[in-house]
């Protein structure tokens, strides 16, 4: 059994400009994530947290974003609002057998996420 962790931290204010770039948003966020960002009331913080989660997942998988699209490392939310990872495309093909858990947090102008990966 292998256990890996990944984490990432982002400056929330950086996403004020990034969210205005359609190309970035289309490549980085799924439709469900974009809907969550738009409905959050704090779009920059929400987007930064989601992006941190994607980076944390990529690191926990042991490769970073090399060869993966950020959009393939998805984040969805359960009925209590807790985030959980959803892999699609080549990420699902390569890592569908790996169990992932993700957590996202914010403080001031900082978003942080951590991911734990368990591979049997």
Model-derived features with residue positions:
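Core catalytic alpha/beta fold that binds nucleotide/phospho-ligands
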Residues: 1-120
């Amino acid at each position: 059994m292998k256990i890996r962790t990944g984490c990432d931290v982002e400056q929330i204010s950086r996403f004020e400009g990034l969210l205005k770039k359609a190309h970035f948003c289309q490549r980085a966020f799924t439709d469900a994530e974009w809907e969550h960002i738009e409905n959050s009331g704090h779009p920059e913080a929400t987007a930064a947290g989601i992006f941190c989660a994607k980076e944390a997942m990529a690191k926990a998988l042991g490769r970073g974003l090399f060869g993966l699209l950020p959009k393939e490392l998805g984040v969805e939310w359960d009925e209590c609002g807790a985030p959980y990872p959803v892999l699609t495309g080549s990420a699902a093909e390569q890592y569908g057998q790996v169990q992932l858990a993700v957590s996202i947090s914010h403080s001031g102008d900082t978003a942080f996420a951590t991911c734990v990966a368990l591979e049997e």
